From Swiss-Prot:
<feature type="binding site">
    <location>
        <position position="87"/>
    </location>
    <ligand>
        <name>5-phospho-alpha-D-ribose 1-diphosphate</name>
    </ligand>
</feature>
<keyword id="KW-0460">Magnesium</keyword>
<feature type="binding site">
    <location>
        <position position="165"/>
    </location>
    <ligand>
        <name>anthranilate 2</name>
    </ligand>
</feature>
<dbReference type="Pfam" id="PF02885">
    <property type="entry name" value="Glycos_trans_3N"/>
</dbReference>
<dbReference type="InterPro" id="IPR017459">
    <property type="entry name" value="Glycosyl_Trfase_fam3_N_dom"/>
</dbReference>
<feature type="binding site">
    <location>
        <position position="225"/>
    </location>
    <ligand>
        <name>Mg(2+) 2</name>
    </ligand>
</feature>
<comment type="subunit">
    <text>Homodimer.</text>
</comment>
<feature type="binding site">
    <location>
        <position position="91"/>
    </location>
    <ligand>
        <name>Mg(2+) 1</name>
    </ligand>
</feature>
<feature type="binding site">
    <location>
        <position position="225"/>
    </location>
    <ligand>
        <name>Mg(2+) 1</name>
    </ligand>
</feature>
<feature type="binding site">
    <location>
        <position position="119"/>
    </location>
    <ligand>
        <name>5-phospho-alpha-D-ribose 1-diphosphate</name>
    </ligand>
</feature>
<comment type="similarity">
    <text>Belongs to the anthranilate phosphoribosyltransferase family.</text>
</comment>
<feature type="binding site">
    <location>
        <begin position="89"/>
        <end position="92"/>
    </location>
    <ligand>
        <name>5-phospho-alpha-D-ribose 1-diphosphate</name>
    </ligand>
</feature>
<feature type="binding site">
    <location>
        <position position="110"/>
    </location>
    <ligand>
        <name>anthranilate 1</name>
    </ligand>
</feature>
<feature type="binding site">
    <location>
        <begin position="82"/>
        <end position="83"/>
    </location>
    <ligand>
        <name>5-phospho-alpha-D-ribose 1-diphosphate</name>
    </ligand>
</feature>
<dbReference type="Pfam" id="PF00591">
    <property type="entry name" value="Glycos_transf_3"/>
</dbReference>
<keyword id="KW-0028">Amino-acid biosynthesis</keyword>
<feature type="binding site">
    <location>
        <begin position="107"/>
        <end position="115"/>
    </location>
    <ligand>
        <name>5-phospho-alpha-D-ribose 1-diphosphate</name>
    </ligand>
</feature>
Length: 339
C-alpha cells in the first residue's frame, strides 16, 4: 500500500487495478484521514487519469448497497454538480421524461452541491422517499420505470472520506466520479460534467465501466447540463470509440436563453418549476428539459439524433406521459411503504 501511495506522491499514474486497491483500503476504513488527504491532493496535483477514475468508481460500486435490476437495461442521467450555476433541477425533471419513453431510469442523486436544491431535496419536497430499501427501489424500477437512489444511502462507506473532503475544501476526484458509481448496472448513461477538459476522458471511463453507449456533456457557461445559452460540448461513447461534437440549441429547433433564465430556488420553488415543466408550461425551463431529455434519449439509443430526442421529449410532455410518471412513482411508493 505504501508503495502505491508513494507512486502518486511521485506524480506517477496508477493502473486501474492499483487504484482499486487503494480505494478499497479507503472504503474499508484502513487508511488514516491524514493519508487519505495526502493521497487526494497528490492525485489532484498530478491530474486524474481515466484508469484511476474507473478504478475508484469500481471500488465504490463493490462496497455499495446493491440494487438488483436486470443487467444492461437501465440508464442514469446524473451530473457531477459543481458548476455554480444555481439552476433548477434539470436532470431530475428530465428523468421523468426519459422514463415516459419506456427507459428504466435509476436516478442517482444527492443533496445540493452547486445550487440551493439538489435532486434529493426536490424529491423530498415532491413527496418522494429518498431512503427506501434496495428491494423497494428494484420494485419501483420494475413497476414504474424510475427510482431515486440517494447517494449517501447507497454508498455508506463514503463516511470514511466525508470529513476529509470537507476539511480540504477543494474539488477532488470524488467530485468527478459520483455519477460513475450508480449501484445499478447501467447499459447507457447521460452524464453532465463541470469540467470541459475531461469530457473525452470521462467517456472513456464509462466505456471501461461497461456502458454500451454514453454521452458526456458540458454545456454553454460550463454547466454540467445541456444549456440553451450557447454551444454545448459533448462526447459520444459507442462500440469502444469516443467522438467529440458540439451542438447549439438552434440546431434542434430551440430558442436561446441566457443562463439567468433557468435560475432555480429552494426545494419548494424547484418542485414547483418541475411540476410546471411536466405540465408543459412554455419557456426556458421547459426547453432546457427538452434539450437535456433529448440528449438522454440519444445517449440511450432510443433515437438517432439529439433533434429526434428533443421532438420525442416534447411529445412525451404534451401527452402527459412524463407527468404521469411522477404521479405513478408517488402512488406506487406509498403502496410499498404501506406494506
Amino acid at each position: 500500500m505504501e508503495i502505491l501511495l508513494q507512486k502518486v506522491y511521485d506524480q506517477k499514474n496508477l493502473s486501474k487495478a492499483e487504484m482499486n486497491i487503494v480505494a478499497t483500503e479507503i472504503f474499508e476504513g484502513r487508511l488514516s484521514k491524514t493519508k487519505i488527504a495526502a493521497f487526494l491532493m497528490a492525485l489532484k496535483v498530478k491530474g486524474e487519469t481515466a484508469e484511476e477514475m474507473a478504478g475508484i468508481a469500481e471500488a465504490m460500486q463493490q462496497v455499495a448497497i446493491q440494487v438488483d435490476f436486470p443487467a444492461g437495461t437501465a440508464m442514469d442521467n446524473c451530473g457531477t454538480g459543481g458548476d455554480k450555476s444555481n439552476s433548477f433541477n434539470i436532470s431530475t425533471t428530465s428523468a421523468f421524461v426519459l422514463a415516459a419513453a419506456g427507459i428504466p431510469v435509476a436516478k442517482h442523486g444527492n443533496r445540493s452541491i452547486s445550487s440551493r436544491s439538489g435532486s434529493a431535496d426536490v424529491c423530498q419536497e415532491l413527496g418522494i422517499d429518498i431512503n427506501m430499501r434496495p428491494e423497494d427501489m428494484t420494485y419501483l424500477l420494475e413497476k414504474v420505470g424510475i427510482a431515486f437512489l440517494f447517494a449517501p444511502h447507497v454508498h455508506p462507506n463514503m463516511k470514511y472520506v466525508m470529513d476529509v473532503r470537507k476539511e480540504l475544501g477543494t474539488p477532488t476526484i470524488f467530485n468527478l466520479i459520483g455519477p460513475l458509481t450508480n449501484p445499478v448496472h447501467l447499459e447507457t448513461q447521460l452524464m453532465g460534467i463541470y469540467r470541459r477538459d475531461l469530457i473525452r476522458q470521462t467517456a472513456e471511463v464509462l466505456g471501461q465501466l461497461g456502458r454500451k453507449r454514453a454521452v458526456v456533456l458540458n454545456g454553454a457557461g460550463f454547466m454540467d447540463e445541456a444549456s440553451l445559452a450557447g454551444e454545448n460540448h459533448y462526447a459520444l461513447y459507442e462500440s469502444g470509440e469516443v467522438h467529440l461534437y458540439t451542438l447549439k440549441p438552434e440546431e434542434v429547433g430551440l430558442a436561446s436563453y441566457p443562463l439567468e433564465a433557468i435560475r432555480g430556488g429552494d426545494a419548494k420553488e424547484n418542485a414547483a418549476i418541475l411540476r410546471s415543466v411536466l405540465d408543459g408550461e412554455p419557456g426556458a425551463y421547459l426547453d432546457t428539459v427538452l434539450l437535456n431529455a433529448g440528449f438522454g434519449l440519444f445517449a440511450n439509443g432510443k433515437v438517432k439524433t439529439v433533434k429526434e430526442g428533443v421532438d420525442l421529449a416534447r411529445d412525451l410532455v404534451r401527452s402527459g406521459l412524463a407527468k404521469q410518471k411522477l404521479q405513478d412513482l408517488i402512488t406506487y411508493q406509498k403502496e410499498v411503504l404501506a406494506k
